[in-house]
Amino acid sequence: ARHHANEVSSTNAAFILIKKLLTEDVYKDLPDKLNLVIVPMENVDGAAIHYELQKEHPNWKFHVARFNSLGKEFYYEHFQQDTIHSEAMGLTRIYDRYVPDMIVDNHGVPSHEWEQQFSGYTSPSYKGFWLPRSLLYGYFWYVTNPEYKDNYPVNKVMEDVIADKIAEYPEMRELNREWSAQFEKYAHAWMPKLFPANYYKEMINYWIPFAADPNHRLSLI
Protein backbone atom coordinates (compact mmCIF):
# COMPACT_ATOMS: atom_id res chain seq x y z
CA ALA A 1 0.00 0.00 0.00
CA ARG A 2 0.87 3.70 -0.24
CA HIS A 3 3.06 3.41 -3.33
CA HIS A 4 1.64 6.84 -4.13
CA ALA A 5 2.06 8.48 -0.76
CA ASN A 6 -0.77 11.00 -1.08
CA GLU A 7 -3.25 8.11 -1.47
CA VAL A 8 -3.63 7.67 2.28
CA SER A 9 -6.64 5.36 2.22
CA SER A 10 -4.49 2.51 0.92
CA THR A 11 -2.58 2.40 4.23
CA ASN A 12 -5.84 2.58 6.17
CA ALA A 13 -7.20 -0.35 4.14
CA ALA A 14 -4.08 -2.39 4.92
CA PHE A 15 -4.46 -1.82 8.67
CA ILE A 16 -8.18 -2.62 8.54
CA LEU A 17 -7.35 -5.89 6.77
CA ILE A 18 -4.73 -6.76 9.40
CA LYS A 19 -7.25 -6.10 12.18
CA LYS A 20 -9.88 -8.31 10.52
CA LEU A 21 -7.42 -11.15 10.05
CA LEU A 22 -6.30 -11.01 13.69
CA THR A 23 -9.68 -10.58 15.36
CA GLU A 24 -12.31 -12.46 13.31
CA ASP A 25 -12.64 -16.21 13.84
CA VAL A 26 -13.43 -16.87 10.20
CA TYR A 27 -9.80 -16.08 9.35
CA LYS A 28 -8.07 -17.92 12.20
CA ASP A 29 -7.00 -20.85 9.98
CA LEU A 30 -5.73 -18.61 7.18
CA PRO A 31 -2.02 -18.79 8.18
CA ASP A 32 -2.16 -22.57 7.70
CA LYS A 33 -3.33 -22.14 4.11
CA LEU A 34 -1.22 -19.35 2.66
CA ASN A 35 1.63 -16.92 3.16
CA LEU A 36 0.31 -13.36 3.32
CA VAL A 37 2.69 -10.39 3.21
CA ILE A 38 1.24 -6.91 3.90
CA VAL A 39 3.23 -3.72 3.31
CA PRO A 40 1.18 -0.81 4.73
CA MET A 41 3.54 1.91 3.44
CA GLU A 42 5.90 1.42 0.50
CA ASN A 43 6.77 5.07 -0.18
CA VAL A 44 7.99 6.31 3.21
CA ASP A 45 9.70 9.47 1.93
CA GLY A 46 6.62 10.54 0.01
CA ALA A 47 4.52 9.87 3.12
CA ALA A 48 6.84 12.11 5.16
CA ILE A 49 6.40 14.90 2.60
CA HIS A 50 2.63 14.42 2.65
CA TYR A 51 2.52 14.54 6.45
CA GLU A 52 4.25 17.93 6.55
CA LEU A 53 2.05 19.40 3.81
CA GLN A 54 -1.26 18.22 5.26
CA LYS A 55 -0.58 20.09 8.50
CA GLU A 56 -1.50 23.32 6.70
CA HIS A 57 -4.13 22.02 4.25
CA PRO A 58 -5.50 18.66 5.46
CA ASN A 59 -8.02 18.32 2.60
CA TRP A 60 -5.78 19.09 -0.36
CA LYS A 61 -4.71 16.41 -2.83
CA PHE A 62 -0.93 17.11 -2.67
CA HIS A 63 0.04 15.49 -5.91
CA VAL A 64 3.62 16.55 -5.14
CA ALA A 65 3.66 13.84 -2.44
CA ARG A 66 2.63 11.16 -4.92
CA PHE A 67 6.25 10.27 -5.68
CA ASN A 68 9.41 9.71 -3.63
CA SER A 69 11.85 12.29 -2.23
CA LEU A 70 13.44 12.76 -5.67
CA GLY A 71 10.09 13.25 -7.40
CA LYS A 72 10.36 9.87 -9.10
CA GLU A 73 7.60 7.43 -10.01
CA PHE A 74 9.71 4.52 -8.79
CA TYR A 75 7.27 1.93 -10.09
CA TYR A 76 9.56 1.76 -13.10
CA GLU A 77 12.47 0.87 -10.81
CA HIS A 78 11.00 -2.39 -9.54
CA PHE A 79 13.21 -5.38 -10.43
CA GLN A 80 16.10 -3.05 -11.33
CA GLN A 81 18.89 -4.31 -9.09
CA ASP A 82 21.09 -1.24 -9.69
CA THR A 83 18.39 1.37 -8.98
CA ILE A 84 19.26 4.37 -6.81
CA HIS A 85 15.63 4.48 -5.64
CA SER A 86 16.02 2.01 -2.80
CA GLU A 87 12.33 1.97 -1.84
CA ALA A 88 11.67 0.14 -5.11
CA MET A 89 13.66 -2.81 -3.77
CA GLY A 90 10.94 -3.57 -1.21
CA LEU A 91 8.63 -5.18 -3.76
CA THR A 92 11.56 -6.70 -5.63
CA ARG A 93 12.83 -8.51 -2.52
CA ILE A 94 9.35 -9.67 -1.52
CA TYR A 95 8.83 -11.04 -5.02
CA ASP A 96 12.19 -12.84 -4.98
CA ARG A 97 11.57 -14.33 -1.54
CA TYR A 98 7.94 -15.44 -1.81
CA VAL A 99 7.28 -15.73 -5.59
CA PRO A 100 3.64 -14.69 -4.97
CA ASP A 101 0.69 -16.05 -6.91
CA MET A 102 -1.04 -12.69 -6.56
CA ILE A 103 -0.05 -9.10 -5.77
CA VAL A 104 -2.64 -6.50 -4.74
CA ASP A 105 -1.32 -2.95 -5.16
CA ASN A 106 -3.64 -0.78 -3.08
CA HIS A 107 -4.08 2.81 -4.25
CA GLY A 108 -6.62 5.45 -3.30
CA VAL A 109 -8.35 8.66 -4.32
CA PRO A 110 -7.32 11.48 -1.97
CA SER A 111 -9.49 14.14 -3.64
CA HIS A 112 -10.92 15.11 -7.01
CA GLU A 113 -8.61 16.06 -9.86
CA TRP A 114 -9.99 19.25 -11.35
CA GLU A 115 -8.39 20.80 -14.43
CA GLN A 116 -9.69 24.03 -15.95
CA GLN A 117 -11.05 23.21 -19.39
CA PHE A 118 -9.14 24.77 -22.33
CA SER A 119 -6.41 26.02 -19.98
CA GLY A 120 -3.62 24.30 -21.90
CA TYR A 121 -3.13 21.57 -19.29
CA THR A 122 -2.13 18.30 -20.90
CA SER A 123 -1.62 14.86 -19.45
CA PRO A 124 -1.28 12.36 -22.32
CA SER A 125 -1.52 9.27 -20.13
CA TYR A 126 -4.71 10.10 -18.23
CA LYS A 127 -7.53 11.55 -20.31
CA GLY A 128 -9.80 10.82 -17.36
CA PHE A 129 -8.43 13.96 -15.67
CA TRP A 130 -10.89 15.80 -17.89
CA LEU A 131 -13.67 14.47 -15.69
CA PRO A 132 -14.27 15.80 -12.17
CA ARG A 133 -15.75 12.43 -11.15
CA SER A 134 -15.73 8.96 -12.62
CA LEU A 135 -17.44 5.65 -12.15
CA LEU A 136 -15.65 2.54 -10.91
CA TYR A 137 -13.80 0.79 -13.70
CA GLY A 138 -11.25 -1.95 -14.22
CA TYR A 139 -8.27 -2.78 -16.41
CA PHE A 140 -7.42 -6.36 -17.29
CA TRP A 141 -3.97 -6.73 -18.83
CA TYR A 142 -3.90 -10.32 -19.99
CA VAL A 143 -1.21 -12.40 -21.72
CA THR A 144 -2.13 -13.90 -25.09
CA ASN A 145 0.55 -16.60 -25.37
CA PRO A 146 -0.96 -20.11 -25.76
CA GLU A 147 1.01 -21.43 -22.79
CA TYR A 148 -0.78 -18.89 -20.56
CA LYS A 149 -4.28 -19.44 -21.95
CA ASP A 150 -5.59 -20.49 -18.53
CA ASN A 151 -5.01 -16.96 -17.21
CA TYR A 152 -7.85 -15.47 -19.24
CA PRO A 153 -10.73 -17.43 -17.62
CA VAL A 154 -9.24 -16.63 -14.20
CA ASN A 155 -9.46 -12.93 -15.08
CA LYS A 156 -13.07 -13.38 -16.18
CA VAL A 157 -13.91 -14.90 -12.80
CA MET A 158 -12.20 -11.96 -11.09
CA GLU A 159 -14.30 -9.60 -13.22
CA ASP A 160 -17.47 -11.26 -11.93
CA VAL A 161 -16.39 -11.35 -8.28
CA ILE A 162 -15.36 -7.68 -8.24
CA ALA A 163 -18.54 -6.47 -9.96
CA ASP A 164 -20.77 -8.58 -7.72
CA LYS A 165 -19.07 -7.40 -4.53
CA ILE A 166 -19.39 -3.75 -5.50
CA ALA A 167 -23.07 -4.30 -6.32
CA GLU A 168 -23.65 -5.58 -2.77
CA TYR A 169 -23.19 -2.03 -1.42
CA PRO A 170 -26.26 0.06 -2.32
CA GLU A 171 -24.49 3.41 -1.88
CA MET A 172 -21.60 2.44 -4.16
CA ARG A 173 -24.00 1.01 -6.71
CA GLU A 174 -26.15 4.14 -6.84
CA LEU A 175 -23.11 6.43 -7.09
CA ASN A 176 -21.75 4.30 -9.90
CA ARG A 177 -25.06 4.57 -11.75
CA GLU A 178 -25.09 8.34 -11.30
CA TRP A 179 -21.52 8.74 -12.53
CA SER A 180 -22.18 6.37 -15.42
CA ALA A 181 -24.95 8.68 -16.61
CA GLN A 182 -22.60 11.67 -16.39
CA PHE A 183 -19.87 9.75 -18.23
CA GLU A 184 -22.31 8.90 -21.02
CA LYS A 185 -23.64 12.44 -21.30
CA TYR A 186 -20.39 14.38 -21.27
CA ALA A 187 -17.73 11.92 -22.49
CA HIS A 188 -18.67 8.67 -24.22
CA ALA A 189 -21.58 10.09 -26.22
CA TRP A 190 -19.35 12.78 -27.71
CA MET A 191 -15.99 11.02 -28.02
CA PRO A 192 -16.56 7.26 -27.95
CA LYS A 193 -13.06 6.43 -29.23
CA LEU A 194 -11.36 8.52 -26.57
CA PHE A 195 -13.77 7.43 -23.83
CA PRO A 196 -14.85 3.86 -24.69
CA ALA A 197 -17.48 2.25 -22.51
CA ASN A 198 -17.40 -1.54 -22.37
CA TYR A 199 -20.05 -2.01 -19.70
CA TYR A 200 -20.23 -5.17 -17.65
CA LYS A 201 -22.53 -5.40 -14.62
CA GLU A 202 -22.66 -1.60 -14.27
CA MET A 203 -18.89 -1.27 -14.47
CA ILE A 204 -16.56 -0.40 -17.33
CA ASN A 205 -13.74 -2.87 -17.86
CA TYR A 206 -10.96 -2.49 -20.38
CA TRP A 207 -9.29 -5.66 -21.66
CA ILE A 208 -5.75 -5.08 -22.91
CA PRO A 209 -4.00 -8.00 -24.65
CA PHE A 210 -0.22 -8.39 -24.48
CA ALA A 211 2.34 -10.97 -25.49
CA ALA A 212 4.43 -12.19 -22.55
CA ASP A 213 7.53 -10.04 -22.09
CA PRO A 214 9.94 -10.68 -19.18
CA ASN A 215 11.31 -7.14 -19.59
CA HIS A 216 7.92 -5.42 -19.38
CA ARG A 217 7.49 -2.87 -16.58
CA LEU A 218 4.42 -4.79 -15.36
CA SER A 219 5.37 -8.07 -13.70
CA LEU A 220 2.09 -9.65 -14.82
CA ILE A 221 3.18 -9.27 -18.48
What are these regions (language model features)?
Residues 8-150:
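Active-site/substrate-binding loop(s) of hydrolase catalytic cores
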Residues 1:
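Short hydrophobic beta-strand that contains or immediately precedes a catalytic carboxylate
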Residues 87-102, 112-221:
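C-terminal accessory segments enriched in acidic
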Residues 7-8, 217:
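Short, solvent-exposed loop/turn elements at domain surfaces
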